A protein has these predicted regions:
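N-terminal [4Fe-4S]-dependent radical SAM core
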Residues: 10-40, 47-48, 205, 211-262, ...
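Radical SAM enzyme core and accessory elements
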Residues: 1-29, 33, 39-41, 488-621
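Flexible loop/turn segments at secondary-structure boundaries
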Residues: 47-50, 79-82, 115-117, 150-153, ...
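Glycine-rich beta-alpha loop elements in corrinoid/cobalamin-binding modules
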Residues: 77-223, 463-515, 522-537
């Protein structure tokens, strides 16, 4: 009989106890005495967020298909539970077995966003695992990190044994088999790590040394062991139809953020937005076969009982078999009484026709992401979306019965001027005017336009990785300019405006392009009490300011400084296919306000063609 790690007294006093009891529908249970490798798969945020993550669902299913591996799940305890565990000295446990995480062979942590870095330390701390990798022994799990933030792993280097660079379906089993062999041989932990570092895509920070120049930039990044490669190559699955995909995702006991079946239709994006990290990291664009997707949709709906299905992609409209897939899903979902969610669609005639059929027009809103207020700045960022297309799409939507529009913009983009900022208000006004051109008896109530601005953060492996970012007060000044210009518009009552927190954005920028020195501040901030920094109610900027000051870190060095063309970045040792030469060329083209065509229109020579697949070979086949 499985025994819960928490007694009834605790479960009755904490918020949402179902976060911690496991045993959900489709959770995988095994006999731990019959497996060779125990793997704790962690999302370092609250259960509802982590349970929504598709990547963990895929890897959980993939690992558990092997009889010799048992993969279990673990999430960050919410602050109330965190306090109980510390007060009562309860170690962090995995959901399936309820066993302490420290008893596992591996702790795999997916790192999706920078603001969860202190939660990673919480996971290690509550598990009784030394925070610093150099202090761990075979009594501790191998701590491995994956996900988009590992494309600059350096701020977290001292906390991880291994970073997995690339897509999870590639070399994990090779690592598991190596682990079994080395443990059977009685190898030391370091002997295992040295051999792991020879597996393509695996980065062991302890085996590399960084030297700095007097100005704080990197002078060199070199392996300390001759057997270790000088660079780490991203691992990628070229045929994403012939790979793992969950048939029966775990169904949470409580409502998750994404409480639905998720169908990943493709990876990558053909659009070369110069601010977008995902668009560069996941090149080349690869599509799943439509028949495979139809089969998976049916299997997952059967296995979960979910009442909604969503298509996952960076740009769903670019999926070449979208009409066939959507028509199938509409018929299948109508038969089952299931809703369809279609994010990342361009607003064109086909999309509007589909959305009319699958959405309640009175309740739903259409979303555009112009990103910039002027055509000049949209050309700088290579958005590929014109004012005419936006207004035409909004007009068709209004004529179709919609009256709610959401618009997403960024402030602080390279070369941005006051005219660009005010252009956000002017575009909102033009959309409102387009609505009120419709005869009154044909309108669906009052027009509601919501404009949201986030603040620009330069990310590694983008053309804007050389760019300076704004200070906190500069971001807020720009938001005020937009707000005041909106208030000056004729249809201001139809336009709502909100913006992201500027102080959080600056911290994200420091962590995104940080080096190993930043890791000391992460540790210090955690010691001061930083936790759940992505949640505004728990974010304390003073913890971070104190941490940077105590560590002698000048935060301006990581944020407002424009990088020189030849600077060595902390992440330059990672090769993602897309070359630094191409990114620099795009940085120059941005300043020239020159648009680069998308991958289906013309190859831009980014370097991803080396993988010999996906969109890079479409025109040749």
């Amino acid at each position: 009989m499985r025994k819960l790690a928490l007694d009834d007294e605790i479960l009755l006093t904490i918020e949402k106890p179902a976060r911690y009891i496991g045993n959900e529908v489709n959770a995988v249970m095994k006999d731990k005495s019959e497996v060779a490798v125990r793997f704790a798969m962690c999302f370092p945020d609250v259960y509802e967020i982590g349970m929504s993550h598709l990547g963990i669902q895929i890897l959980y299913d993939m690992f558990n298909q092997r009889d010799d591996i048992w993969c279990e799940r673990v999430y960050s305890p919410w602050p109330d539970m965190d306090k109980v565990m510390r007060d009562k000295k309860i170690p962090l446990f995995a959901l399936e077995s309820q066993d302490p995480v420290k008893d596992f062979d591996f702790l795999g942590i997916t790192i999706q966003y920078e603001m969860c870095y202190t939660n990673i330390l919480q996971i290690l701390d509550l598990s009784g695992i030394p925070l610093l990798a150099e202090k761990r022994t075979w009594d501790d799990p191998i701590v491995i990190g994956g996900g988009p933030c590992t494309y600059n792993p350096e701020p977290l280097a001292q906390f991880f044994d291994i970073f997995y660079i690339g897509e999870g379906e590639t070399v994990y089993f090779q690592l598991m088999d190596l682990y079994k062999e080395e443990r059977a041989k009685g190898s030391s932990r370091m002997e295992f790590l040295k051999k792991a570092a020879q597996i393509p895509g695996l980065y062991v920070p302890a085996l590399y040394e960084v030297c700095y120049k007097e100005d704080g930039t990197i002078a060199s990044f070199t392996p300390t062991d001759a057997s270790v490669p000088a660079s780490v190559e991203k691992q990628i699955v070229m045929d994403i139809t012939d790979t793992y995909y969950s048939k029966a995702p775990v169904v949470p006991f409580i409502k998750a953020t994404q409480d639905r079946v998720v169908l990943e239709i493709q990876r990558g994006c053909i659009r070369g937005c110069r601010f977008c990290q995902a668009g560069m990291l996941y090149r080349p664009t690869r599509e799943r076969d439509v028949e495979f997707l139809k089969q998976k949709a049916v299997e997952m709906l059967d296995a979960t009982g979910h009442e909604e299905i969503s298509l996952s992609s960076l740009s769903s409209s670019d999926y070449s078999q979208l009409p066939e897939l959507v028509n199938f899903l509409m018929e299948e979902c109508d038969r089952r009484g299931v809703n369809i969610s279609l994010p990342s669609l361009r607003i064109d005639a086909f999309s509007l026709d589909v959305m009319k059929k699958v959405q309640d027009i009175k309740k739903s809103s259409l979303t555009f992401a112009p990103e910039a207020g002027s055509q000049r700045l949209r050309d700088v960022i290579n958005k590929g979306l014109t004012r005419e297309v936006i207004l035409e799409g909004a007009g068709k939507a209004f004529e179709g019965g919609w009256n709610k529009v959401k618009l997403y913009f960024m402030l602080g983009l390279p070369t941005e001027t006051e005219d660009d900022m005010k252009g956000i208000a002017h575009l909102c006004e033009e959309i409102a005017e387009r609505y009120y051109e419709i005869p009154k008896d044909q309108r669906n109530g009052k027009c509601q336009i919501t404009a949201s601005t986030s603040f620009f953060v330069p990310k590694p492996f983008t053309p804007f990785q050389w760019a300076p970012m704004c200070r906190e007060e500069e971001f807020l000044d720009r938001a005020r300019i937009v707000r005041e210009e909106i208030h000056a518009q004729l249809n201001q009552k139809s336009i709502r405006y909100n913006w992201h927190e500027a102080d959080v954005t600056v911290l994200e920028g420091i962590l995104a392009r940080g080096d190993r020195k930043v890791g000391d501040a992460i540790l210090k901030a955690y010691e001061h009490g930083a936790l759940f920094d992505a949640w505004s109610e728990y974010y304390h900027p003073e913890y971070w300011k104190e941490a940077f000051a105590e560590c002698g870190i000048d935060t301006d060095f990581y944020t407002i400084r424009e990088r020189s063309d030849d600077e060595i970045f902390p992440w330059d040792f990672i090769h993602i296919g897309v070359t630094k030469k191409f990114l620099l060329r795009e940085w120059k083209r941005a300043h020239e306000e020159t648009v680069t065509p998308n991958c289906r229109m013309q190859c831009s020579g980014c370097g991803a063609a080396k993988y010999q697949g996906g969109v890079c070979v479409e025109s040749k086949s």
